[in-house]
């Protein structure tokens, strides 16, 4: 009798084991142990880093701890172009650069950098999370990249060591470091500044040595990188809304199972709202903190901002004429929709 009971127990345990194996194929079969090298340019106290950490927590939870994200902040894996090449080559798995860095491989990403295109965060999110943002993302796989959505970097503002910027004329003659991106170059040329393209990692040294007079970045970047130590004036030009884009190496992506890809997409989607919230709260705090560190802060009168928009308009029209007309039409339609 005992033998029969033990046999039945053994059979039921085996059946239960099989049922369990079938119920959790995610962890048992098609999720492998993986280490994902996630590089970015920002410091560990910057909102982009908080986004990486939240993404890592979510992905670890979804994969039963099998998919681990290893963060490399502060340009440890190279500048934006070096990290982009590493993703394309499959050497690095993930990065979160500014969308501006992609204009060299998909020129239509320049649309995101058009000056004074959006007036607030709600408009920015609607533009990037909607059809335009997705149409741009669809251009990346053929370039060796997969994008999982957009994070917040913030509205860009000018700092310099010479004078407050209260009107467009105040930019005249200033050597302003810009992202190596044609839209930024031509925008600041329109303001009669002297734009100097330069990798982000070299920027602090260039400001310190006075190789350049100023730069333009969101408040949280200005604070996190201690630019207030080498820049006296912070001016709320709000000339461009900047976003980061969560990128994955296509070579790495193609090596993942559908389930692993699903977990990565879900973790990216769920971390996006958190990252944006943290980033926007940090930007609000940063202005006061910059003033406390001795920076002179000024806002621009709406009339002067409107003048800047008019000066930049021919730049927008010139670049729009050089892009894929279908994407430009989509951009125009979307801008009209989000401004309603």
Predicted features by range, described:
Residues 29-123, 131-134, 138-340:
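N-terminal secretory/targeting leader peptides
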Residues 18-22:
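Hydrophobic alpha-helical targeting segments used for export or membrane insertion
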Residues 24-28:
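Sec/Tat signal peptide C-region and signal peptidase I cleavage site
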Residues 2-16:
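Bacterial N-terminal signal peptides that target proteins for export
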């Amino acid at each position: 009798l005992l033998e029969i009971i033990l046999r039945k127990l053994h059979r039921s345990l085996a059946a239960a084991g099989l049922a369990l194996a079938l119920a959790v194929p995610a962890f048992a079969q098609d999720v492998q142990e993986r280490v994902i090298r996630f590089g970015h340019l920002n410091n560990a106290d910057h909102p982009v880093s908080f986004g990486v950490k939240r993404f890592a927590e979510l992905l670890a939870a979804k994969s039963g701890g099998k998919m681990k994200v290893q963060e490399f902040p502060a340009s440890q894996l190279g500048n934006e172009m070096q990290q982009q090449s590493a993703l394309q080559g499959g050497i690095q798995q993930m990065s979160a650069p500014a969308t501006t860095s992609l204009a060299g491989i998909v020129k239509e990403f320049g649309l995101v950098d058009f000056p004074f295109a959006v007036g607030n965060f709600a408009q920015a999110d609607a533009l990037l999370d909607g059809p335009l943002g997705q149409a741009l993302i669809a251009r990346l796989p053929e370039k060796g990249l997969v994008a999982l959505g957009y994070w917040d970097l913030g509205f860009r503002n000018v700092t310099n060591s010479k004078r407050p910027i209260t009107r467009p004329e105040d930019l005249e003659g200033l050597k302003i470091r810009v992202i190596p991106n044609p839209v930024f170059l031509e925008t600041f040329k329109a303001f009669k500044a002297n734009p100097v393209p330069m990798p982000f990692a070299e920027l602090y040294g260039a400001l310190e040595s006075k190789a350049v007079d100023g730069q333009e970045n969101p408040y949280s970047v200005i604070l996190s990188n201690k630019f207030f130590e080498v820049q006296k004036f912070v001016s709320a030009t709000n000339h461009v809304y900047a976003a980061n884009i969560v990128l994955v190496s296509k070579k790495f992506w193609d090596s993942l199972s559908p389930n692993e890809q699903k977990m990565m997409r879900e973790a990216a989607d769920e971390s996006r709202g958190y990252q944006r919230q943290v980033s926007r709260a940090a930007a609000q705090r940063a202005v006061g903190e910059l003033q406390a560190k001795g920076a002179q802060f000024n806002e621009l009168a709406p009339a002067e901002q409107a003048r800047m928009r008019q000066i930049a308009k021919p730049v927008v029209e010139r670049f729009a004429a050089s892009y894929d007309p279908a994407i430009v039409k989509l951009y125009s339609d979307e801008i009209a929709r989000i401004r309603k």
